[in-house]
Amino acid sequence: MNATLETNQLRQLDQQHHLHPFTDFRDYAQNGGRIVSRAEHIYIFDSDGNKIQDAMSGLWCCSLGYSQDGIKQAVADQLMELPFYNNFFKCSNQPAVELASRLTSMAPAHFNKVFFTNSGSEANDTQIKFVHRYFQLLGKPEKRLIISRKNAYHGSTIAAGSLGGMSAMHEQTQGLNYIHHIEQPHWFELGGDMSSDEFGLWAANELAKKIDELGEDKVAAFIAEPIQGAGGVIIPPDTYWPAVQKILDERDILFISDEVI
């Protein structure tokens, strides 16, 4: 079978049976998509023979490239020894223990626990549970509201999609009513005549205003990407984060850093 025929058959099967996320299905039904067949170093190769630099690193998760022999061997060895076992009911395994220890050794001292998840969406769903349980244990169950930002991306589940600030995702399902959004710190789009430093303080004050509107006794956390990736790789002004941290500290509100890039 020649490569073109095989690619056409794969595209047809893909169109018939494979439901893709974040896809224009009308366009896909008419024109098909790309079949990625292999990868090497920082490049992917499609079934038409095109070599493409993978600037997205898979989906941000292959930043070490595709040709690390040590990683491949470690995966193969682990599949032979113990492909999977859960960590419920006080169970663990050597790789999980060693990885948790290594991660905490590289983090600031107060980051001393690791909870493993399968995706960013799952991680942020879990963050909501952690935040709510934290304030329940402190005797403040009324602190449940979470503030996020417009144009943010925090995942695609109902909870993570609600945390995100992309309106197209909110049109697909009803969001969670305890999640609220403020303006993003996008100086180039929203700064107007303000300097970068002035805009950073203005954007941080949007958080303070929202907390005052909702009631600091009801707001549990603020979630944000240090750099907004999917929103356009938006880097806040230097004045933004120190002002945000001060606002949160003064009001007993947690900060969830959704850091990917």
Predicted features along the sequence, with ranges:
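Active-site-adjacent loop/helix segments that line or gate small-molecule/cofactor pockets in enzymes
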Residues: 2-39, 81, 95, 199, ...
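Active-site and channel-lining beta-strand-loop segments
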Residues: 33-55
